[in-house]
Amino acid sequence: MSQLCPCGSAVEYSLCCHPYVSGEKVAPDPEHLMRSRYCAFVMQDADYLIKTWHPSCGAAALRAELIAGFAHTEWLGLTVFEHCWQDADNIGFVSFVARFTEGGKTGAIIERSRFLKENGQWYYIDGTRPQFGRNDPCPCGSGKKFKKCCGQ
């Protein structure tokens, strides 16, 4: 039985993010890396998350924190609403909403992630949290106001 990819692509996991998470392939661009990293959170794969963080970030030191977080978080969905990169610059950005429940409460991470390409491989560097007004449209694309959607 085939399983849809957790990244929200509507493609089977085996044909979408699995080749990246399993190490068969390297993500070709920041959006694919972002989606595969989301899958790694869903599948509780700390090794892939650490491997795809830029080495300068010292992600290996976060292993215990990542694993502890897996036990309390259920990921509900990912919406990528903007992505841009130029291979010539070796830098890219992906803006997304990742929805989750933790301790019985629903939440969302809204982030503009920054990626760097080195030696043919994209790495996650860091992210910023954009500010939205309570009455702004929610960036997840629901059509609702931010305060009634991901801003709760």
Curated annotation (Swiss-Prot):
SUPFAM superfamilies: NTF2-like (SSF54427), Sec-C motif (SSF103642). Belongs to the UPF0225 family. PANTHER family: ADENYLATE CYCLASE-ASSOCIATED CAP C-TERMINAL DOMAIN-CONTAINING PROTEIN, UPF0225 PROTEIN SCO1677. This is UPF0225 protein YchJ.
